[in-house]
Amino acid sequence: MMKKSYDTEIISVGTELLLGHVTNTDARDVSEQLSKIGVNVRYHTVVGDNPERLAQCIETAKGRADIIITTGGLGPTCDDLTKVVTARAFGVPLVEDKSETAGLYEYIKNSRHFTPNNFSQTMLPEGCTVFHNTCGTAPGCAFEKDGKIVLMLPGPPKECYAMLTKSAIPYLRRLGDGEIVSHSVRIFGIGESAVDAIFAEEMNVMTNPSMAPYAKECDCLVQVTAKAETQEEAETMVRPVMEHVKERLGEYVYGVDVESVEESVMQLLHSRPMT
């Protein structure tokens, strides 16, 4: 029997995201990894480095999500306010994590660019589970309060992804209500609307597994997705639908689970082997 379904909101913090100076890959990565463990992402929110607006976003998330995940704003500068604002919103004090402080001393002891404000990073919500940062200095964390599960991850994409996969996903895996498997059939020479017309009747009645066409920059894909208690069961559900899609689309199919025509051609050349 599957577990309770948890709704998640991702709050990405950073004025640079709103200005378009940085692409929000963190939200994409978090969503992708959560989908693999059956945790539903319902909302993406982006907010600048403003404590009042961030507090409003957290209050909104508290009213509609079971899991709140923030990315960004954990660094040592004056505009890194995610921990302070989030902890205040849940009435949790920030306390020094001595293990992280010791680790930070070790990390920066030979640095010429050390400043005392670096140690603000080791102030964390009391009683939280600490996520060590293997790619930087700002730790993340998770805590539970008022029936909500709160995770805070760093903003730099490399740091966020490493912490997400090594710490956050293992922490959240217990909450997933099943396993999700998704595969794509890549096609060239036929448009999204034509593919939709071919499969319209089937897609209207399919729920699990499901399929949907998507237009990409130079081609299209048909995404087939299934959810089950185990990955093996989900794979079994997806397999016949994938075969059906490939059979119906025939000569338009150039690959499965590839990113582009170029990648498919390269794989073909390597398999020959040819250059």
Tell where the protein language model's regions lie, with residue ranges:
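Short amphipathic alpha-helices in soluble, non-transmembrane regions
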Residues: 236-247
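Accessory alpha-helical/coil subdomains and C-terminal extensions
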Residues: 144-218, 223-225, 233-238
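Glycine-rich beta-strand-to-loop/alpha-helix junction loops that act as flexible
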Residues: 13-15, 70-78, 154, 228
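Short alpha-helical segments enriched in small residues
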Residues: 245-275
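Conserved hydrophobic helix-helix packing surfaces used for dimerization/oligomerization
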Residues: 8-10, 150, 274-275
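Glycine-rich phosphate/diphosphate-binding loop of Rossmann-like nucleotide-binding domains
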Residues: 2-45, 232-236
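Proline/glycine-rich low-complexity loops and linkers
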Residues: 53-56, 63, 80-175
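Short beta->alpha junction loops
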Residues: 43-53
